[in-house]
Every structure is written in C-alpha cells, then in structure tokens.
A protein has these predicted regions:
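Active-site substrate-binding loop specific to GH73 endo-beta-N-acetylglucosaminidase modules
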Residues: 106
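Ferredoxin-type iron-sulfur electron-transfer modules and their immediate structural context
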Residues: 1-102, 110-318, 324-325
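A short alpha/beta connector and helix-capping loop motif
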Residues: 329-346
C-alpha cells in the first residue's frame, strides 16, 4: 500500500476522486499485519472450558473461537489444534486461534481465562508464526457459524459471530475497543455510529486503515465522526434522518400496493415490510428478497425504492464518545438526547 509505505505524496489527485465525499474503504486495517507483539497467546485445548471469555475481552479481535463441521475439520491444516465441542455444540469441532500478525501481546486473554489450569500461555511470537496459517484458514475458509446459536444469549455465543471491528491501531490492552467489537458482533450488520472526536476517532478512521468491515453479505457498520461538543446531537440527527427516509419508504410502498405493474410477490413483500418495519430480522429478510425483484420490474414505485434500498433493513443507531465528550463539553447534548426518548444507544 502506497500510504502505508509512507509514499502517499506520490499519489495523483485522481486516486482520491472516489472518496471526495469523505468515505474510505472498509476493512483495510486487516491488510496492515503489523506484527508488533513480542509474545502472543497459545491455546492449550486440554485445559479449555470453551467459555470464549478470552475473545470477548480481546481489544483487537485477534483471538477468536471457531466451529468446524466434519468436512472443514478434515480440510484443516495439519498443525491446527481442535477440541470436541461441548454441550449443544458437541457435533462440531472447536478451535481457538490467534492472528499472530495482528495481536499486540497485551495478555488480557490470559489474565481473564477462568480455567483452573490456564488454557492460554504466552509464547514467543517468533515460535508461533505457524498459527497465522491456521487463523487465516479458519477466518476465510471456515467462517462464522453465528446462526446455529443465539448470539445475544451469552458471552460465549456472541463470540461465534464475526467481529465487524477488527485489528485497529488502538493501544495494547485498550479498554474501549472490546466494547465496540462486541457491539458490532451483535448489531454490526445494521449499525450506524456517530463518533465523538478522541481515541475512538484515531483507531477508528486513521486513513487508510479502517477497522470497521463488512460480513460475507457486504453488510457492516456505517461510521461518521463529529466533535466533542455535539456528538450526541450528531447521532440523534442521523437517527432522525434515517427515520425520515424510512417514512418515505413506507409511503412509496403504501402507494405501490395499488400499482398495476407491481407483481403479487412484490406487493406481499411490501405488506410484510409495512407490518414489520421496525423488526430487524424481518426487514433484513424482506430486503434480501425484495431488492432483486425490484431491479427487474417496470414498477415506478420500485424504481423509487431502489434509491433507498440500504435503508430497508431496520437500523441500530449508536453514539460513541469518551469521558470528555460525555461528562464535560458535550454533557448538555447528552442530557437532551437522553431526555428525547428517541431509540438511540449511547
């Protein structure tokens, strides 16, 4: 990468034209592979109780649990350690793997491991290089089986979901990033984030490295940064703007129910969306079915709706700021936004 090679001043203006609106490519932090850790955790499967607490506290999403079926386990690299899944996951093989090149060596995972004999021990990063191949295989070939468990039920289940915030440039042992990472595992495919200037804006959007990424379906958090003094109002504005767009969608769909050029299938999906427009699961399902149909019809209402297709799935608005923004210069806005009763998360 030209910028990471400190040769960004050689780039022509034309290189930046796709990003004149302030956007930047998602998931680019995954390509940095800084390899800054001297020591990294190594999994001891015989001691592991498979609680996933280590992954839960990892500031950089560098240690992750994976579930493998029989075919995936058979295709795994020879050096990959596997254990039999426990309880309702006994039909799967369980693996805990570390991205050695992305780990910062903070040791948080080892500290929180509740096993009587620690299931993680710190070893030289030089001696653990082979683990990177295992992690890459699990991350790209096996993936995340978050649909076979209720990821919102427990810490353990949540960690089987793909983090949509990974490998940021936050300090080793950061206490902020685990919260963001875990929120993206629960809501990331439909999140909008209003961020206050501070650490979260540095590790969250230092061009060209973005730790916010997308899942296999291309869905991920939308992130924007504001100042200390108005971060809550900024987030409330994002929520109100999204609500107005979705109100427009509802109006177009209501009119579309009487459109002769809309098929019965499209009208049924319109009706389902209108009845469940604030239900995340239903609206995502409807959107996945509806968009391809609307792209292949002459219905004028469908053509209008395609402009707003990214807003079909119900969104989850988050507002993230530090102590200075929340308790000092931005408290007035925080107080008013909380009092508004709007459905935002701070």
């Amino acid at each position: 990468d030209v910028v990471n090679s400190q040769a960004g001043d050689t780039l022509p203006v034309s290189s930046f034209m796709p990003y004149v609106d302030g956007t930047m490519p998602a998931g680019t932090a995954a390509y940095e592979k800084r390899g800054v850790a001297v020591f990294v955790p190594q999994w001891q499967p015989d001691n592991c109780i498979q609680c996933n607490t280590c992954a839960f506290v990892c500031p950089h999403a560098a240690i992750r649990p994976f579930l493998l079926n029989e075919e995936e386990a058979a295709a795994a690299p020879a050096g990959l350690k596997l254990a039999q899944g426990k309880a309702n996951l006994k039909d799967y093989k369980f693996a805990l793997s570390v991205s050695v090149a992305d780990c910062t060596g903070c040791g948080n995972c080892v500290d929180v491991c509740p096993a009587k004999e620690k299931a993680l021990v710190m070893v030289s990063a030089l001696d653990a290089q082979a683990e990177q191949e295992n992690f890459d295989f699990l991350n790209t070939k096996v993936g995340y089986k978050e649909t076979i468990v209720n990821k919102a039920q427990s810490v353990k289940n949540s960690q089987f979901a793909q983090p949509l915030f990974e490998f940021s440039g936050a300090c080793a042992g950061c206490g902020e990033t685990p919260y963001i990472k875990n929120i993206t595992q629960l809501f990331g495919d439909r999140m909008m984030i209003a961020n206050a200037t501070g650490c979260s804006s540095i590790y969250g959007a230092s061009f060209p490295a973005s730790p916010y990424c997308t899942n296999s379906e291309g869905h991920g958090p939308a992130w924007a940064n504001s100042l200390f003094e108005d971060f809550c109002e900024f987030g409330l504005g994002m929520k109100l703007g999204s609500d107005r767009i979705r109100q427009t969608i509802a109006e177009i769909m209501t009119e579309g129910l009487d459109c002769d050029k809309a098929s019965d299938e499209i009208k049924a999906l319109f009706k389902q969306w209108l009845e469940n427009k604030n239900n995340p699961a239903v609206t995502r399902e409807v959107a996945d079915k509806l968009v391809p149909l609307m792209e292949n019809t002459d219905c004028p209402h469908c053509k209008k709706l395609l402009t707003y297709k990214k807003f079909l799935a119900a969104r989850s608005q988050w507002i993230i700021g530090g102590d200075g923004a929340s308790y000092d210069i931005g408290y007035g806005g925080l107080d008013h936004v909380l009092a508004s009763g709007e459905n935002v998360n701070i």
